[in-house]
Regions:
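Juxtamembrane intracellular "pre-TM" segments in multi-pass secondary transporters
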Residues: 1-5, 184-222
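Helix-loop boundary and gating motifs at the non-cytosolic
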Residues: 2-51, 217-224, 228-256
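Hydrophobic core of transmembrane alpha-helices in multi-pass small-molecule transporters
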Residues: 16, 98-115, 226, 306-320
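Loop-to-transmembrane helix entry/capping segments in MFS-fold secondary transporters
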Residues: 40-41, 129-141, 250-251, 333-345
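Helix-to-loop junctions at the C-terminal end of transmembrane segments
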Residues: 57-71, 157, 267-279, 364-365
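Structural signature of the two symmetry-related core transmembrane helices
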Residues: 75-89, 282-297
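Intracellular juxtamembrane helix-capping segments at the cytosolic ends
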Residues: 113-128, 320-333
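Symmetry-related core transmembrane helices of the 12-TM Major Facilitator Superfamily/SLC fold
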Residues: 165-182, 372-390
Length: 406
């Protein structure tokens, strides 16, 4: 196996494990929490608190990592895996204390989101050190890991109960921790790392105001992304309720998650070729339009067929957004700002989730499914308009409006 295949395989394995656990923790959050007696509103509150904490935590951690001290991308991922493992082990055995379940689940939900941008930053860090990683392929295989887990976990939970979810998470996180521990540069890559530390780079923009003043178009993309993921998280966090309203159950939940995740693989694997012709900024706008169509379909859905049609738009929405966002940051930002840039992308996803969590459960409990989906559609449409405005703004202060740089 050549070095390119070796590094890509290792990074793909980290992504597969991450998104398998993402399925059991995030995609199945409502299933697990409602099995412990939580209402829709309580689920929404818990996820909102976890998302708010994560949105605040991510840029802070990114700034620490960007300063290149003891805390590296790899070490933070290892710490995160350990925390999620311990928390999931606690959830497996705590069944009757809702306050404890609330706190522990919020922590592991928050930590898992917090290390997602660090996973992306790890790839681009290693690439700069000479580790030839095909990001799109590895990230797409992560989605395939989510898809395969979804296909089995829905039926398994229906048969064995929601207690299975934290048990599976414990196993996945144990494997992840071992894999991360051994996934590190050696030899030539370490020499490149040492050279990088002594070389000197552009000034890091630690303050939020300084950062977004330096990258005006990125600020608009972040705001647009919040709107996109308001709609996206509304569907994902309350998917079981949407599916039940359309006549399905946990098995259909698994199939639905499988469909949207497996469709991500070919797009992410081929995104490098697309980026030779289309700029990351334009792809971000395109993905926003796909998020809009995806939730719009659900307003008029009458059965599970339309749910699957809606989920198929993941091919153009999330599957395009994630790699396009990663490449946008990598190509337009100074090296010492890139972990923060990746963190702000994930923070936008998280903040969208916060507003969705705060409103969706309340709207669902008091007004019903369709008003919830109409709200998500309207917010997503605003995001599409903002993303178009971003194309007319410079990516860095003093530049012309966005133009892709190879």
């Amino acid at each position: 196996m050549n070095k390119k295949a070796l590094w890509t395989t290792g990074y793909a394995f980290l992504n597969i494990a991450y998104f398998a656990a993402f399925c059991t923790v995030h995609a199945c959050a409502a299933v697990f929490l409602m099995s412990r007696g939580f209402t829709n509103t309580q689920v929404g509150m818990l996820l909102a608190i976890a998302n708010i904490t994560s949105a605040l935590f991510q840029p802070f951690i990114a700034d620490v990592i960007d300063k290149k001290g003891w805390l590296t991308n790899r070490r933070f991922i290892l710490i995160s895996c350990t925390v999620i493992l311990i928390g999931s082990l606690m959830l497996r055995f705590i069944t009757d204390s809702k306050p404890v379940i609330f706190i522990v689940y919020a922590i592991i939900y928050m930590i898992q989101f917090a290390y997602q941008p660090v996973m992306t930053a790890l790839c681009f860090e290693y690439r700069k050190k000479g580790c030839d990683i095909v990001y799109g392929l590895a990230r797409g295989l992560g989605s395939a890991g989510f898809a395969v887990t979804s296909a089995f976990i829905g039926r398994a939970v229906e048969a064995k109960g929601a207690d299975l979810l934290p048990a599976v998470t414990v196993i996945i996180m144990a494997v992840s921790a071992v894999a991360v521990f051994f996934y590190r540069p050696s030899g030539k890559e370490k020499a490149a790392e040492a050279a990088e530390v002594t070389e000197g780079t552009e000034k890091s923009h630690g303050k939020v105001t300084d950062f977004f003043r330096e990258y005006p178009a990125f600020l608009l993309f972040v705001i647009a992304s919040i709107c996109f993921f308001f709609a996206h998280n509304m569907i994902n966090d309350f998917m079981i309720q949407i599916i039940r309203a359309l006549g399905g159950g946990e098995t259909e939940l698994g199939y639905s998650n499988f469909l949207q995740a497996i469709l991500e693989l070919p797009v992410m694997a081929l995104i490098g070729f697309v980026l030779r012709k289309v700029s990351p900024a334009k792809l971000l706008v395109f993905s926003g339009a796909a998020f809009f169509v995806k939730i719009l379909i659900l307003i008029f859905a009458q059965n599970m067929v339309w749910m699957f049609v809606s989920q198929s738009f993941q091919l153009f929405a999330y599957a395009v957004f994630i790699p396009a966002g990663a490449y946008y940051v990598s190509h337009t930002m100074a090296e010492n700002d890139q972990v923060k840039g990746q963190a702000y992308v994930t923070s936008a996803i998280t903040i969208g989730g916060v507003f969705s969590n705060l409103l969706s459960g309340i709207i669902l409990d008091n007004l019903g499914m369709r008003p919830m989906l109409i709200t998500g559609t309207a917010v997503c449409f605003v995001g599409v308009l903002i993303s178009f405005a971003a194309l007319r703004s410079p990516d860095r202060k003093g530049d012309q409006p966005y133009e892709y740089r190879s």
